Design a protein with these regions (language model features):
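Positively charged n-region of N-terminal signal peptides that target proteins for export
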Residues: 1-5
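Periplasmic OmpA-like peptidoglycan-binding domain that tethers envelope proteins to the cell wall
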Residues: 126-130, 139, 144, 448-518
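Exported/periplasmic ABC-transporter solute-binding proteins
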Residues: 25-438, 463, 467, 471, ...
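Bacterial N-terminal signal peptides
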Residues: 7-17
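Sec/Tat signal peptide C-region and signal peptidase I cleavage site
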Residues: 18-23
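Short loop/turn segments at strand-loop or loop-helix junctions that form parts
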Residues: 411-412, 445-450
Length: 518
């Protein structure tokens, strides 16, 4: 929270974007002159005024009022304004690529104007050179993105982690809505937290529990992990970066430990990866998309299962340390062109751009059962007794004619609520169904569980989860005839584990709902 407050104060003084141009006094008067409202203009989307008044922030339909004052926008030559602040990982490569292709597909020219190292503006023009939009970027950190939003200096936040409870509370108090709702946050692309070491380090895998012990200082020598008798040197991004905070939230906090003192901090992802690559005794946690010359470790458990980050394991969320890239959108109207850009980020062309930019896209991929040998081997290994073998046979008979979609669903730890990536998957699958991609096909939502507790109970829980996800997708479909696609459910409980059940991490990976198609 102290970093949030510091960033918020900094935002009040440092962030100067096109949004600040609106901050002038206006008077909105009804056309019959009977009603008058004065205040500071915060924004105009071409149809609605957003004004800070003595009654609080109000949104007023421009068709019913006349605007007077120095801050009044032009109604005939309206320019859509949007400011975007947050993670440099997202803002330096991915968002510019999406803006440029979005402009091209809409017959617009995109000109990038660089103001300094952290500020740039995209000006979108028609063929007649008329300016129709300005998208202003501030690329810094996830922390500062949320601070800019709270300071009313940003319309969108680029984040490498989920919003924290303190930020969520402040946003609600500021009237920005519940930012972890499905309509207030969306996954732009996928990434993962990857444990990295030097290429000469003999270690090839590590458990998440051991990672937490290393980061907290409980393990300080590589010999404990099967390596050389030498001290471990820890490298991390700066404390305000999204990846460092994601490690804190999802690794350290869940293990009830804190990062040890004496950690080597780095200002950029590239510097972090190179420092670890050059340090034979070093270890760090980096974005999957920016491992560089370092070596990425697999995640393993005591039962022998191991998971390595790659495009498919990140898409399916089988790799437990996925790190979605978020856009957070406050509860306010954006200009029409800005809303169209946000809709574009979920399209198939946008997924292609995302992959070309070096990130993991959200486009579903189909995987045959024959291509899942490791999973089947795990299933055979844990099949226990006649009941276990019978369930495994039913699984193979049922799923052999189908293909697994990379779209999967998992839940928040200890909750029935879908996690952030899965909530985005609900929307992605619903949009695909609306587009007719699965017309004439069968989609089966298949539930799996961990191996804790009685098998019958696990099978029942897995079936209930599959039914809940199917219902969530059906409810998210807004403009489609569901009779064109067959939606069913099934469940196999603990029959096909992905990870060891002796840790909370492994159990969370195993509790899932997959989608299989025919």
């Amino acid at each position: 929270m102290k970093y949030l407050r510091a960033a918020l104060l900094a935002a009040l003084f440092l962030f100067s974007t096109v949004i600040s141009a609106w901050a002038e006094d206006v008077v909105l008067r009804s056309r019959d002159g009977a009603v008058e409202l004065s205040g500071t203009l915060l924004g105009f989307d071409g149809q609605f005024y957003r004004v800070e008044t003595k009654y609080g922030e109000l949104t007023v339909d421009g068709s019913g009022v006349v605007c007077e004052g120095p801050g009044c926008p032009s109604l005939t030559n309206f320019v859509a304004e949007m400011s975007i602040s947050g993670s440099s990982t997202i803002g330096e490569v991915l968002m510019p690529a999406l803006v440029e292709v979005f402009a091209l597909q809409n017959g617009l020219k995109a000109e990038r104007i660089t103001e300094d190292d952290t500020h740039f503006i995209y000006v979108l023009r028609t063929d007649e050179d008329a300016v129709v939009a300005r998208f202003a970027f501030r690329v810094s950190s996830t922390d500062e993105g949320f601070a800019d939003l709270l300071a009313d200096e940003a319309d969108l936040v680029m984040a490498l982690r989920e919003i924290r409870p303190g930020e969520l509370e402040l946003a609600e108090e500021a009237g920005l809505g519940t930012l972890d709702d499905v309509n207030r946050s969306r996954v732009l692309a996928l990434d993962a937290m990857t444990v990295i070491v030097s290429p000469v380090n003999p270690i090839s895998a590590m458990s998440i529990s051991d990672l937490a012990r290393v980061l907290s200082g409980d393990i300080t020598n590589w010999r404990t992990l099967g390596g050389p008798d030498a001290p471990i040197s820890i490298h991390m991004r700066d404390a305000q970066s999204g990846i460092a905070q994601a490690v804190e939230d999802r690794v350290l906090r869940r293990a009830a430990v804190e990062l040890r003192d004496g950690v080597n901090r780095h200002a950029t992802n590239g510097e972090l990866a190179q420092a670890v690559a050059d340090d034979q005794l070093g270890i760090g946690v980096a974005n999957y998309s920016e491992v560089g010359n370092s070596k990425a470790l697999a995640l393993t458990g005591t039962c022998g299962f191991s998971l390595r980050a790659n495009r498919l394991t990140i898409k399916t969320e089988d790799y437990p340390l996925t790190a979605p890239m978020f856009l957070y959108i406050p509860a306010r109207r954006l200009p029409k062109l800005a809303r169209e850009f946000l809709a574009y980020t979920r399209t198939v062309p946008a997924q292609i751009i995302t992959r070309r930019a070096g990130f993991v896209d959200q486009a579903p991929e189909e995987i045959t059962l024959n291509a899942q040998g490791d999973r089947l081997a795990n299933a055979v290994r844990v099949a226990d007794g006649d009941a276990g073998l019978s369930n495994l046979k039913r699984l193979i008979d049922t799923l052999s004619p189908l293909r697994r979609l990379s779209t999967s669903f998992r839940f928040e730890p200890g909750q029935t609520r879908l996690d952030a990536q899965s909530r985005s998957n609900v929307q992605q699958l619903a949009r695909a169904m609306e587009a007719g991609i699965y017309d004439g096909r069968k989609l089966m939502f298949v539930g799996f569980s961990d191996g804790e507790g009685p098998a019958d109970g696990n099978l029942r829980i897995a079936r209930e989860r599959a039914q809940a996800v199917k219902l969530a997708v059906e409810n998210a479909v807004e403009a489609s005839n569901l009779s064109q696609v067959v939606l069913t459910t099934d469940a196999f409980g603990e029959a096909m584990p992905m990870a060891c059940d002796d840790t909370s991490w492994g159990r969370q990976v195993n509790r899932r709902v997959e989608v299989w198609v025919r």
